Amino acid sequence: MLKIGVVGCGAIASLITKALMSDRLNKAEVLAFYDGNLEKAEKLAMETGADFCRSLDELVSKDLDLIVECASVTAVEDTVIKSLNNDKDVIVMSVGAFADKDLFLKLYKLAEKLGRKIYIPSGAIAGIDAVKSGSLGKISEVTLTTTKPVHGLKSALEEQGLNTDDIMDPKVVFEGTVFEAISKFPQNINVSVVLSLASKYPAKVKIIADPNLMVNRHEILVKGSIGTIKTCVENNPCKDNPKTSALAAYSAIQLIKDLSEPVRIGT
């Protein structure tokens, strides 16, 4: 039985927990929760019968195998360091934190030193296996075009001074590097960092706000010595958090199941 603790108790954490609770094979179980908003952690703990922790230190000190970070990019460094130092592997959902190359290298070296693992799910995009394999050759271009409903980008756009009520047709709201994208859309474009890490090449990112779209669309183009990889995924937004896709949570659930299975499919 894989014993799991969860940091961050929002929509993604709830989806992951409920899926594992309903898993008939019962090879993994969430045993403890922590959130900076203690009420959220206490509520989810009461709903599931798991422990409610009042601090991250309390969570990582428990008898757990794996910590799942579902909080925010700002929570990643502390969560990963404390988890690794307490002999626990970590799944990082807020992978946008790794747009900071220095942070990624720091945590990579710590995990290597301690003999622990940091897992990054594929998230809401397809083709990561092929992109990782292709990165063994020479990559010459990586682009990501993400189109989302306006309401899913609303908070990020308004922070940049854009009135979302004025967007009546599909509008390009960002074009630039993966590093710029994650700084302006930290809750919307984690997939760009996953793609860049998998390809070992900095992705060019375009973000489109579409008032008529009901799904989150991610189009990937990768060119290199292996040829061309093109994928397009249209994901249903998470019901409780339209900034992200339900598939992002499902990718973490599948990763957890893979960790407890004797056979693993895919790269």
UniProtKB/Swiss-Prot annotation:
Key words, A-Z: NAD, NADP, Oxidoreductase, Pyridine nucleotide biosynthesis
Catalytic reaction list: L-aspartate + NADP(+) + H2O = oxaloacetate + NH4(+) + NADPH + H(+); L-aspartate + NAD(+) + H2O = oxaloacetate + NH4(+) + NADH + H(+)
EC number: 1.4.1.21
Active site: H218
Recorded metabolic or biological pathway in which this protein acts: Cofactor biosynthesis; NAD(+) biosynthesis; iminoaspartate from L-aspartate (dehydrogenase route): step 1/1
UniProt record similarity statement: Belongs to the L-aspartate dehydrogenase family.
Other information: The iminoaspartate product is unstable in aqueous solution and can decompose to oxaloacetate and ammonia.
Function, as annotated: Specifically catalyzes the NAD or NADP-dependent dehydrogenation of L-aspartate to iminoaspartate.
Protein name: L-aspartate dehydrogenase
Originating species: Methanococcus maripaludis (strain C7 / ATCC BAA-1331)
